Amino acid sequence: GKTANRAEEARLATGCVGVRRTTGQHPGGLVVIPQENEIWDFCPVQHPADDPNSDQITTHFEYHSMEENLLKLDMLGHDDPTMIRMMEDMTGVDAKTIPLDDKDTMSIFTSSKVLGYEDDPILGPTGAVAIPEFNTRFTRGMLMDTMPTRFDTLVRLSGFSHGTDVWLGNAKDLIISKTATVDSTIGCRDDIMIYLISCGMLEKRSFKIMEAVRKGRGLPDGAEEEMVQAGVPDWYIGSCKKIKYLFPKAHAVAYVMMAFRIAWFKVHHPLPFYAAYFYRRSQKGGFDAALMTGGIDNVIANIDAIDNNEDASAKDEDLLTTLEVVYEFYLRGFSFAPISIYDSHAIKFLIKDGKILPPFVAISGLGESAAWDLMEGRKGKTFLSIEEVAAACPKVSKTHMQMLKDAGAFGSLPDTSQISLF
């Protein structure tokens, strides 16, 4: 170690004040350090769980405190590629070959007719439930206000939803009042620069105005007068002044391409779509077999219970998202097979005889460790009783065994192997 005098110790200690002790999971921000430096030239570091032997080091300093000196990359995890890969594996379809102008797929953003139901009282007029970017009640409302029929309109809507003060109190009002069309409103950063250049303004000035607006700084000095002289309408100038943050168009295009491919599977390969979606939800604790596999009436009752509960928790709201998709799954004529000790996978939703077979982790409270233990314990075995299953799977608790029994996973297996002679 290094020796330091009291003054240096006090200086270093001051720099550590306010640092978090617990690390938890980081979403994947990577701080890039120049080759001739080390991270501790800029800030202290931590080892996860205070384990000095760990290869991973993290820092919990607010990034803006060092953004003038260091580059940070946000390498965030994404669910959509996982879902697409699963659907590719189940169907043999390469997602990159999916046409982005498929009419049936495009239609679900305005109508659910192609899915076999219309104007549902729970899901509304569109078929966009479970489609990334467009699956919340807020974005489905946005679809109804704009009725998109082209891919580029979906890109604009993605910009609306990811921006701050871009849709509500801004573009939405302009569209509903017919002051502007969807295509003429500001959705992404690039829209401003391209539009101003088309009005005859200088490219560099158009870029500077776009940069100021997208960061929420309003219009630069003199810009409003220049825009008026170029023939930019008052409503457009007013819209620029309201914006606090604008999404980049390339980012929106990437998101919408992914969403459209997933929507294509929903229309043309529904069972693989739902199997992949439910898997994704179950990985986050958002799928509960007890609430979701008991038929459409049971699902409607659970949706109503959460909707009518003013004190619904964040977990309830998360379950509601899945319940809506399960409701649609039933509405389209599909159903679940009962969880089976012999056939269910530990974590994946399987397609069996035209039905979806939930995994063991779909049972609330049964974790992956116990689920894999069940898969391992059943290999090459035919059980005579539930007691034998418990003996073969030591990581599965009595509580879990009861949950499996309640879910019908054991079929007609008796509790014990003992035979009564009388």
Language-model features, listed with the residues they occupy:
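Noncatalytic, beta-rich nucleic-acid-contacting surfaces in large DNA/RNA-processing enzymes
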Residues: 1-422
